[in-house]
């Protein structure tokens, strides 16, 4: 492909972009999302032509000027207030364009010519809808997990996840939440090609971050470990949320898996100025505002994309603060997956408390025939205790290759 201008790249299909990426020897081109591939190609082609191009996430300072962060050159690129207003730029936008070197006493490179915003031509950015003006609705399309791992299939039957779901994974220590999140991420990516998966790890151990990165290959992973300042925890979360909103405005489907909402609330409790009021456990009610705003951003947009958020909430940690945080978030989601450490101690994995887990308006996510079969299964499981119910369901799942086959044979299995 000869004599291609950077302005023309935006019209290329993903297949043609990959062919071009192969010519430019871009590593991993076959698995890179289209927007990221477009950005890398612009940078590669411009560099080959002797131009200075860059791309990065827009970080707007005090609602005036901004900087492109996380650029390939590891520099911050200044974006003027006039450029932000002209193109209607927003926090978290991914921008690619020509940049110039610092002039005179300037400290930073400057954005000279804006080419693309979030993978689309810059002049179209002003026409985007605003996230908060979009109409939310109940999730009506289920994420396909029915042929995945045992843990994903249990979730698909007991607490189905729709596009736009706002879910809590209620987890005591050592109940296997990290493994469940890894399985979920891999199965969502494998069986739902129109969905991007982002994982946020807040206040986690560094080795757990490494483990997630090694086990979940095609997800975007954002991490702030426990040895980093709490301000970093807040910054990472807020930037990811803004970037997700930009994707939803384009009509895309994003799934965010977060571990953990409890630790995020702790970090806000440290960083937020005191309101002079304290809840039991020493937590300032003001510090819960932003974590609630984060979880509340999950929604299905009527006639558009969706933002699905599944976040872990820690219980039985011995901390009164953690219990208060959980109580404050209880009921804010429309899906709950409850893990039980006693089940894990019985070597039952996933340690899902089937009787306490569920999804609101789940009938919207199943066909009528599927929902009738689910009701029969649930009524049967209610007659058993937690361990018996989980063991029965796991054995049932292992006899069928998919949940669809299982539900079609539910009358036979329950001897109805």
Curated annotation (Swiss-Prot):
Which enzyme class, named as a word? hydrolase
Q: SMART domains in the record, alphabetically? A: AAA
Instruction: List ligand-binding residues for ATP.
Output: 162-167, 174-179, 205
Aminoacyl-tRNA synthetase among keywords: no
Keywords of the record, alphabetical order, are: ATP-binding, Helicase, Hydrolase, Nucleotide-binding, RNA-binding, Transcription, Transcription regulation, Transcription termination
Single Gene Ontology MF annotation: ATP hydrolysis activity
List residues of the Rho RNA-BD domain: 51-121
What are the BP-aspect GO terms? DNA-templated transcription termination
Enzyme Commission identifier(s): 3.6.4.-
- Keyword Acyltransferase in record: no
What CDD domains does the annotation carry? rho_factor_C
Give the similarity note. Belongs to the Rho family.
Q: What does this protein do?
A: Facilitates transcription termination by a mechanism that involves Rho binding to the nascent RNA, activation of Rho's RNA-dependent ATPase activity, and release of the mRNA from the DNA template.
Q: Subunit composition?
A: Homohexamer. The homohexamer assembles into an open ring structure.
Protein name per Swiss-Prot or TrEMBL: Transcription termination factor Rho
| Naturally occurring in which organism (per UniProt) | Streptobacillus moniliformis (strain ATCC 14647 / DSM 12112 / NCTC 10651 / 9901)
Q: What is the lineage of its organism?
A: Bacteria, Fusobacteriati, Fusobacteriota, Fusobacteriia, Fusobacteriales
């Amino acid at each position: 492909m000869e004599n291609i201008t950077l302005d023309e790249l935006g019209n290329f299909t993903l297949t043609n972009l990959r062919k071009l990426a192969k010519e430019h020897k871009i590593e991993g081109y076959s698995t890179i999302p289209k927007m990221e591939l477009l950005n890398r190609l612009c940078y590669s082609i411009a560099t080959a032509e002797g131009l200075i191009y860059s791309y990065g996430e827009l970080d707007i300072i005090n609602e005036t000027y901004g900087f492109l962060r996380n650029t390939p050159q590891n520099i911050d690129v200044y974006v003027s207030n006039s450029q932000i207003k002209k193109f209607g730029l927003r926090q978290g936008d991914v921008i690619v364009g020509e940049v110039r070197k610092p002039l005179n006493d300037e400290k930073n490179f400057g954005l000279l010519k804006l080419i693309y915003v979030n993978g689309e031509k810059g002049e179209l950015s002003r026409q985007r809808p605003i996230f908060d003006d979009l109409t939310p609705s109940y999730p009506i399309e289920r994420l396909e997990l029915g042929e995945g791992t045992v843990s994903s299939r249990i979730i698909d039957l007991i607490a189905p996840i729709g596009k736009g779901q706002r879910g809590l994974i209620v987890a005591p220590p050592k109940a296997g939440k990290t493994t469940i999140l890894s399985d979920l991420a891999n199965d969502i990516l494998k069986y739902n090609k129109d969905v991007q998966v982002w994982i946020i790890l807040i206040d986690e151990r560094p080795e757990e971050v490494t483990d997630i990165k090694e086990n979940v290959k095609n997800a975007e992973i954002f991490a702030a470990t426990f040895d980093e300042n709490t301000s970093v925890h807040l910054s990472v979360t807020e930037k990811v949320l803004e970037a997700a909103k930009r994707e939803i405005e384009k009509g895309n489907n994003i799934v965010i898996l977060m571990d953990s909402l409890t630790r995020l609330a702790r970090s806000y409790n440290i960083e937020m100025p005191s309101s002079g009021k304290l809840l039991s456990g020493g937590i300032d009610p003001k510090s819960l505002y932003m974590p609630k705003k984060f979880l509340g951003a999950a929604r299905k947009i009527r006639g558009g994309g969706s933002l699905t958020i599944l976040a872990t909430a820690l219980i039985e940690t011995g901390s009164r603060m953690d219990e208060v945080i959980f109580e404050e978030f209880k009921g804010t989601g429309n899906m709950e997956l409850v893990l039980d450490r006693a089940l894990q101690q019985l070597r039952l994995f996933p340690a899902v408390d089937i009787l306490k887990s569920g999804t609101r308006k789940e009938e919207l996510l199943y066909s009528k025939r599927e929902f009738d079969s689910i009701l029969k299964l649930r009524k049967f499981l209610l007659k058993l205790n937690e361990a018996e119910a989980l063991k029965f369901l796991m054995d049932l799942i292992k006899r069928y290759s998919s949940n669809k086959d299982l539900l079609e044979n539910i009358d036979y299995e329950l001897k109805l």
